[in-house]
Amino acid sequence: MQKISYVIPCYRSQHTVGGVVAEIAATMQTLPQYDYEVILVNDCSPDDTFGTIRSLVAADNHVVGVDLAKNFG
């Protein structure tokens, strides 16, 4: 099975990243021939973006979270 990886930089995204993951999951349900992962990269966001990412990781085994120690732009 082929795999698609979505790598999404996140900055001040605590209120929007969940919707993005939900849209990707809905799209991938229409493509059963592919496995997928969503890699959410918190770019040292000052809000609770990484808290939201942690919740998404706990709820969906397709989601991986990365927390950067400083903003890389």
What are these regions (language model features)?
Residues 42-50:
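A conserved acidic beta->alpha catalytic loop
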Residues 13-29, 52:
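Short, well-formed alpha-helical segments that are part of the catalytic scaffolds
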Residues 10-12, 43:
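Aromatic-flanked redox-active Cys/Sec active sites in thiol-based oxidoreductases
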Residues 3-5, 37:
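Cell-envelope/extracellular polymer assembly enzymes that use nucleotide-activated donors
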Residues 50-73:
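Conserved donor nucleotide-binding strand/loop of the catalytic core
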Residues 31-36, 61-62:
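A generic structural motif
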Residues 18, 36, 43-44:
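Glycine/alanine-rich phosphate-binding loops at beta-alpha junctions
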